[in-house]
């Protein structure tokens, strides 16, 4: 279980907090959508969660492990894929996955890499340099790298951007399978229709604060998620 309590972050020289009193609970098996417009605080929350940003107040705990008190051990149990991941493009796909495995000090066999790559239909491209990959293929190799050490939590920032419909469908099926086995997924997206159909839980952030969170059906009520989202944003 991931628990975020009272998370507050203020950037240097800023007049106000970027995010304030963020409280979220993600349980094993959850596919948790995180939505809000540009500048609402999604990226700041995510960067605090994965240890890129420090924060002034609050706590982030994964199965009782604090990111502040045990940052290295915490990060070993999560993965993060940004919307435009930086990859070592001079490496082949196989070399990149082996590199990531070594960073996590994981003993991963060639068979493990090939089997995971097959789920993304990338097994025939593993020996090619990443610089020759399309955007969608680069997104796939980043996801394979994120999953190879079997994290408890994977954090995705706009994971479906640049993926063709087949690749997006395959990714959703893979995420469903992983979550059925107990992994947690937390992802931001501007595609509300995908979030509504795909996520069992949702949080909406506005002006750095969570304005609604919980089960998808509870957040949207009898309306569509788009209607519920717009209604919340029309309120001052």
Predicted segments — roles?
Residues 1-4, 8-21, 71:
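A short, flexible loop at the N-terminus of ABC-type nucleotide-binding domains that lies
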Residues 58-69, 73-74:
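Conserved ABC transporter NBD signature motif
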Residues 98, 102, 108-125:
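Conserved ABC ATPase "signature" region
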Residues 143:
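Hydrophobic anchor residue at the start of the ABC signature
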Residues 154-158:
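Catalytic Walker B motif of ABC-type/P-loop ATPase nucleotide-binding domains
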Residues 213-214:
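ABC ATPase "signature
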